[in-house]
């Protein structure tokens, strides 16, 4: 069974890059789902078993969450997923504590700094 990954990133170029990095970093048993906004990400998570992941047949194992999105903030999603059994990684342009510490408090397991060249 493929490991499911959700990538929430509103910038199509950055999202494509993250997809490529995930594919190249892991085996070919990866199934990547892409979302460009919070609404779509929430819908994909519901399909995989809801915010707890307990009822899903195959929940996401890794979720990459952009902090700044057109329809909200990625920390909103992190707060909703505190019981979800996936590793949650924040992707952001900002390396300061004002952005990273709150994300970690909301349930992020780590962060990945993005370049601003996208």
Map each language-model feature to its residues:
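Acidic, metal-coordinating helix/loop segments flanking the phosphotransfer/catalytic sites
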Residues: 34-62
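Acidic catalytic/metal-coordinating carboxylates
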Residues: 37, 73-76
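Conserved acidic carboxylate
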Residues: 9
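Active-site residues of response regulator receiver
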Residues: 66, 92
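The feature encodes the CheY-like receiver
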Residues: 70, 96
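Short amphipathic alpha-helix used as the core "switch/output" element in two-component signaling
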Residues: 75-86
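Two-component/phosphorelay signaling modules centered on CheY-like receiver
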Residues: 12-36
């Amino acid at each position: 069974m493929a490991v499911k990954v959700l990538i929430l990133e509103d910038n199509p170029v950055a999202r494509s890059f993250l997809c490529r990095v995930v594919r190249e970093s892991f085996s070919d048993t990866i199934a990547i789902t892409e979302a460009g906004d919070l609404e779509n990400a929430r819908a994909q998570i519901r399909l995989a078993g809801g915010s707890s992941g307990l009822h899903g047949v195959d929940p996401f194992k890794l979720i990459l969450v952009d902090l700044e999105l057109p329809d909200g903030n990625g920390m909103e999603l992190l707060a909703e997923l505190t019981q979800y059994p996936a590793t949650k990684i924040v992707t952001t342009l900002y390396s300061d504590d004002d952005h990273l510490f709150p994300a970690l408090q909301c349930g992020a397991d780590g962060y990945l700094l993005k370049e601003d060249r996208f």
